[in-house]
């Protein structure tokens, strides 16, 4: 049965065989769930102890997403695996692949604000994915602090809420209770591992999270420097600010809306 062959190819991390099976003339893609196969692939990749196998699992994941597989449903037990985003950060393999998995799964619809449970001092604590990633900052065996910071940026770009419960209508607080914030998770991380206070990626992550909370959103946070530039530009255009910078001089005669659009494009791309 072709479905059994496909499952076997996923388990063996045989991306070439998997691709051939998907493209076979007798392969009926409607006979099975691509979403379920993607979930199976994520689990297999996280449990694999071979980096080579894990890389092939990632390639299989990309093939499934290219075929239309979605990652917007729970992966397993609702309390512990609310999102497929939980599994890559438990992987035994290369942290670069964890980042690639996050890019792939979020692009396929994985919810950056999904809730899962984390054991903290023997108690089950509810955390959004961003808080969970921040909480485990001290764990550097499987993922570098640089790549963990990259995961934080990916989640924030996708709309992750660093401060749950504050103007967040998407959270069912009656069902889950108030999850821990990303700021709390970062503070708790450095309390458990004081050396993080001198880690440039931890410091950058904390500055980013606090900046996003203060600004109200990741997009607003990114635009703060642009707004400051426009404020200076406006002063220069009105003759209240003198500059020797050639770039600023060239911008004085350009409409502010044009300047804003150009710099916003550079930042977001």
Language-model region placement:
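Cullin-RING E3 adaptor/co-adaptor recruitment helices
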Residues: 171-269
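Ankyrin repeat domain, specifically the short helix-to-loop turn at the C-terminus of the second helix
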Residues: 19-29, 59-71, 100-112, 150-162
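Short helix-adjacent coil turns
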Residues: 9-17, 200
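Ankyrin-repeat intra-repeat helix-capping/turn positions
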Residues: 13, 45, 49, 56, ...
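Ankyrin-repeat helical core positions
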Residues: 10-11, 22-26, 42, 46, ...
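Generic preference for well-ordered alpha-helical elements
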Residues: 3, 15, 82, 244, ...
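Ankyrin-repeat boundary/"N-cap" motif
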Residues: 2-8, 30-49, 73-92, 115-142, ...
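Extended HEAT/HEAT-like alpha-solenoid repeat tracts in very large eukaryotic scaffold/adaptor proteins
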Residues: 53-60, 101, 105, 125-133, ...
């Amino acid at each position: 049965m072709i479905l059994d062959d496909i499952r076997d190819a996923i388990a063996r991390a045989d991306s070439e065989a998997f691709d051939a099976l998907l493209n076979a003339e007798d392969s009926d893609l409607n006979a099975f769930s691509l979403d379920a196969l993607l979930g199976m692939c994520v689990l297999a990749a996280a449990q694999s102890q071979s980096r080579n196998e894990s890389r092939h699992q990632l390639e299989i994941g990309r093939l499934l997403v290219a075929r239309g597989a979605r990652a917007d449903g729970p992966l397993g037990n609702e309390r512990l695996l609310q999102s497929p985003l939980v599994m890559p950060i438990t992987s035994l393999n290369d942290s670069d692949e964890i980042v690639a998995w996050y890019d792939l799964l979020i692009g396929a619809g994985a919810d950056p604000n999904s809730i899962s449970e984390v054991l903290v001092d023997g108690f089950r604590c509810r955390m959004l994915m961003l808080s969970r990633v921040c909480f485990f900052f001290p764990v550097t065996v499987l993922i570098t602090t640089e790549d963990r910071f990259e995961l934080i940026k990916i989640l924030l770009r996708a709309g992750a809420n660093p401060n749950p419960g504050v103007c967040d209508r998407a959270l069912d607080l009656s069902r889950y209770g108030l999850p821990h914030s990303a700021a709390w998770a970062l503070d708790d991380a450095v309390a458990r591992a004081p050396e993080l206070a001198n880690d440039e990626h931890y410091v950058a992550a904390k500055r980013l999270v606090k900046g996003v909370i203060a600004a109200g959103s990741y997009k607003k946070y990114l635009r703060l420097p642009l707004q400051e530039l426009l404020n200076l530009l406006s002063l220069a255009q009105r003759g209240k600010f003198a500059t020797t910078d050639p770039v600023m001089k060239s911008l004085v005669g350009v409409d502010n809306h044009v300047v804003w659009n150009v710099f916003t494009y550079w930042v977001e791309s």
